[in-house]
UniProtKB/Swiss-Prot annotation:
Name of protein: Genome polyprotein
Record note on modification: Genome polyprotein of potyviruses undergoes post-translational proteolytic processing by the main proteinase NIa-pro resulting in the production of at least ten individual proteins. The P1 proteinase and the HC-pro cleave only their respective C-termini autocatalytically. 6K1 is essential for proper proteolytic separation of P3 from CI.
Keywords: Acetylation, Capsid protein, Virion
Residue spans of biased composition, Basic and acidic residues class: 16-28
Sites bearing N-acetylserine, chain numbering: S1
Length: 293
């Protein structure tokens, strides 16, 4: 019947399912397991996109090649040199000394310091009652005037500046009195500008400063050094240095500085007790050997 056929089919189906479950639980053989692992590895590698790495080969070294030679660098200041010592300790910092390279003009005692020059400039501006822009024009005129007339501490009166055909006069008193240590040392700050100015004037026409004319300087190429506040430095040519020294020696030759001037109190305080009569020869002579003349 239909029910009996259905009952007979069910056990057959169950038997088939049990058989398939047993096949799943049955362990795989060794070769099959290795093959499966290999296939899984290939699939994983394909999915990740990685490629097998190969070892980097070292470059071949030529037996006849030589290495590089390094030139030894000597120390600029050797620590073995004899240094000033206090309590067996050096009092110099060599690391700072190697880097300390100041401009020789800034540490020269032949020119005014920056503080002294600033004080001189401000005092002149105050006494002339001008602003900074006007002071710059006056400094141009003062520099050119000093090129021609020098910077002697004995100068007095007025210095002049020309505006077209008009001549303007300015007192020298604030310039000389406020210059510390001296006017020449203050004017040495203008040395490079004065040298360039003389060179510029010579481009238009022959120009020799009065300082060079008085010293009878014949070489026109040395005109740029012919002013008394020129500052000699390491770049000064030998001929220019010699010419400047000769002009300076000629300018100060025969000049003497007296520490003391003539005392104004020259009267004598002694009392003259001599008595003279009208018959005396003179005020200081009574007679010659007792005879009247």
């Amino acid at each position: 019947s239909g029910n009996e056929d259905a009952g007979n089919v069910k056990p057959a189906a169950g038997t088939k399912e049990n058989k398939s479950d047993k096949e799943k639980d049955k362990p795989e053989s060794g070769n099959a397991a290795n093959a499966k692992a290999t296939s899984n590895t290939k699939e994983d590698g394909g999915e990740s996109g990685t490629k097998p790495t190969t070892a980097n080969k070292d470059k071949d070294v030529d037996v006849g090649s030589t290495g590089t030679f390094v030139i030894p660098k000597l120390k600029k200041v050797s620590p073995k040199m004899r240094l000033p010592m206090v309590s067996n300790k050096a009092i110099l910092n060599l690391d700072h000394l190697i880097q300390y390279k100041p401009d020789q003009r800034d540490i020269s005692n032949a020119r005014a310091t920056h503080t002294q020059f600033q004080f001189w400039y401000n005092r002149i501006k105050k006494e002339y009652d001008v602003d900074d822009e006007q002071m710059r024009i006056l400094m141009n005129g003062l520099m050119v005037w000093c090129i021609e007339n020098g910077t002697s501490p004995d100068i007095n009166g007025y210095w002049t500046m020309v505006d077209g055909n008009n001549q303007s006069e300015f007192p020298l008193k604030p310039i000389v009195e406020n210059a510390k240590p001296t006017l020449r040392q203050c004017m040495m700050h203008f040395s490079d500008a004065a040298e360039a100015y003389i060179e510029m004037r010579n481009l238009d026409e022959p120009y020799m400063p009065r300082y060079g004319l008085l010293r009878n300087l014949n070489d026109k190429s040395l005109a740029r050094y012919a002013f008394d506040f020129y500052e000699i430095n390491s770049r000064t040519p030998n001929r220019a240095r010699e010419a400047h020294a000769q002009m300076k020696a000629a300018a100060i030759r025969g000049s003497t500085n007296h520490m003391f001037g003539l005392d104004g109190n020259v009267g004598e305080s002694s009392e003259n007790t001599e008595r003279h009569t009208a018959a005396d020869v003179s005020r200081n002579v009574h007679t010659y050997r007792g005879a009247k003349i």
